[in-house]
Amino acid sequence: MAKRVTGPEIEKLIQLLAKVPGLGPRSARRAALHLVKKKEQLLGPLAEAMGEAHRKVKICSCCGNVDTIDPCTVCGDERRDQAVIIVVEDVADLWALERAGAMNAAYHVLGGTLSPLDGIGPEDLNIRALVDRVAKGGVRELIIAVNATVEGQTTAHYITDQLEGMEVRITRLAHGVPVGGELDYLDEGTLAAALRARTAI
């Protein structure tokens, strides 16, 4: 058994940091050590910011984004085209699309994808609220922007089935060759999808 080299407070900090996606035990130890070395400049302000976030962060009742206000900043933006809704798996996807800045549409966060093997069914996701949003009217297009995985495609098909008969255009993101990508480095599935989704030039 390894000897303890620090007190329980720092051990707890390391254990909590190790739960952050992308940080394993070693990275968490390095991060914790860096934080405690920079106690005044970094650890204190970080603890304060985290406490503030803990008190103020909410889930948007309209789209599922995280913000300090409800409805969120995105839903409250009157310049957005509310008739176009981009459906994403999680908040990180929403933020990524916003960084791209390609569309000024509304969003809907599902909170994951259907995965019967993991016990995740339609009732575990934010699908009913999406169907209700479309049923209210005023939605012209739904862009399904989920990952190109089996679970993502299953979720896309399920949503399409739920919206059958409603006056809404349903599209999905194009799949294929990334900008700057070289064909030799792409997998067969990506190449096949790119060929099927080819467009005229």
Swiss-Prot record:
**Which protein family is named in the record?**
Belongs to the RecR family.
Question: One GO biological process from the UniProt record?
Answer: DNA recombination
Please give the name of this protein.
Answer: Recombination protein RecR
Check the record and name the SUPFAM superfamilies matching this protein.
Answer: Recombination protein RecR
- Source species, domain of life: Bacteria
The protein's matches in PROSITE patterns, at most eight in alphabetical order, are given as: RECR (PS01300), TOPRIM (PS50880)
- Which CDD domains does the annotation name? TOPRIM_recR (cd01025)
Q: What's the stated role of this polypeptide?
A: May play a role in DNA repair. It seems to be involved in an RecBC-independent recombinational process of DNA repair. It may act with RecF and RecO.
Kindly give the InterPro entries that the UniProt entry links to this protein.
DNA_Rcmb_RecR, Rcmb_RecR, Rcmb_RecR_Znf, TOPRIM_dom, TOPRIM_RecR
Q: Where is the Toprim domain?
A: 83-178
The entry lists its GO molecular-function terms as: DNA binding; zinc ion binding
Listed Pfam families = RecR_C (PF21175), RecR_HhH (PF21176), Toprim_4 (PF13662)
Source organism per entry reads: Sinorhizobium medicae (strain WSM419)
Keywords in alphabetical order: DNA damage, DNA recombination, DNA repair, Metal-binding, Zinc, Zinc-finger
Q: Zinc finger regions typed C4-type: which residues?
A: 60-75
